[in-house]
Amino acid sequence: MFGRFIRQYSTSKNIINVNELIVEKTKTPFQKYTDKTKLVFGKQFSDHMIEVQWTKEEGWGVPKISGYHNLSIPPSASVLHYALECFEGMKAYKDSNGKIRLFRPDQNMNRFLNSAKRICLPEFNKEAVIELIKKLCVLDKDWIPEGKGYSLYLRPTLIATQNSLGVGASNSALMFVIASPVGPYYPEGFKPVKLIADDQYVRAWAGGSGAFKLGSNYAPTIFPQLEAAKKGFSQVLWLLNDYVTEVGTMNMFVFWNNAQGEKELITPPLGDGTILPGVTRDSILKLTQQWGEFKITEKNFTMTELAKAIKEGRVFEAFGAGTAAIVSPIESISYKGENYSIPIDASLNCGPLTKRISDSIMAIQYGETNSDWSVIVD
């Protein structure tokens, strides 16, 4: 996919040396949360962070873990003017034995690297970043809340720091990782969401950057989201020429009887740059394929087709999928002034498949089910 991009940096300069890591423990630790049930996503941060500087001339510098602190970059830094920035979202979990676990960190690093390439930020050795993240998790292990649904959210980020207003590949960059303790997305059980499908605004398009985790993809979605909220909707169901793409910041899944009468779990395909390759998305596809109980399809489908299927009673469930919630059940979609209701099991506040997927993935994340997807942090 990236063959058409010119490789600008030598391989030797793309290596982060974990053995050179410098650890400076903070002398002013934060006051840690006292009630984990009151944690709010992204509002409190752990004591330490990772930083690694990069320059075109020298490559990656010495990695460092130190106390959480503000960054110092010039006001002309490329990231501030041209959005040369990419990031990841992943979590560290603490199992019932107190062991720290990461969920498929290799997949996050694959996407992180692909995002960096897309905007000409420096390449890096993925394994080294995972090792640095593990060391941060061990150092800040007391910040990982115990219990199902609780975790330490990790935010690897890579920004261009070149001191220039010219539009082009940056000759300097900074990678950093911060961490935030978080609670369950649905602390009191699933809460189905109401969507509005509106083609007035477009999140991504073929050949664009929607398949990469760039900050520039998120800023334009805020206004449509606020407009949707004013109308009483939880999220926007993003369309592209009537084709269903994503829901809010999540991948979209529909479980239905398709037009051929087959029971099918369907999600929009990757490949044209429109859909973000979600780690949870991939996990759901692989997990349900292992079950072998119904057809699994990555295929484009339109909102018109979905509305018709709902009217005909062929839709069993629909849900969004992502790191924050794992799955988010959908109870209705507003489309062209008409409301389309999707079945919800009142006893579960979601559909049976949605619940089963959530339970299955969470069991892996917390080490209850043995899987190589769950990586123990030594």
From Swiss-Prot:
Molecular function per GO: branched-chain-amino-acid transaminase activity; L-isoleucine-2-oxoglutarate transaminase activity; L-leucine-2-oxoglutarate transaminase activity; L-valine-2-oxoglutarate transaminase activity
Listed cofactors: pyridoxal 5'-phosphate
Keyword Transferase: yes
Keywords tagged on the record: Amino-acid biosynthesis, Aminotransferase, Branched-chain amino acid biosynthesis, Pyridoxal phosphate, Transferase
A Pfam family it matches: Aminotran_4
GO biological process: amino acid biosynthetic process; branched-chain amino acid biosynthetic process
Gene3D superfamilies named in the record: 3.30.470.10, D-amino Acid Aminotransferase, subunit A, domain 2
EC number: 2.6.1.42
Highest rank taxon of the organism: Eukaryota
Reactions catalysed: L-leucine + 2-oxoglutarate = 4-methyl-2-oxopentanoate + L-glutamate; L-isoleucine + 2-oxoglutarate = (S)-3-methyl-2-oxopentanoate + L-glutamate; L-valine + 2-oxoglutarate = 3-methyl-2-oxobutanoate + L-glutamate
CDD domains assigned: BCAT_beta_family
Keyword Cell inner membrane: no
Family: Belongs to the class-IV pyridoxal-phosphate-dependent aminotransferase family.
Oligomeric form and interacting partners: Homodimer.
Primary role: Catalyzes the first reaction in the catabolism of the essential branched chain amino acids leucine, isoleucine, and valine.
Descriptive protein name: Branched-chain-amino-acid aminotransferase
Species of the source: Dictyostelium discoideum
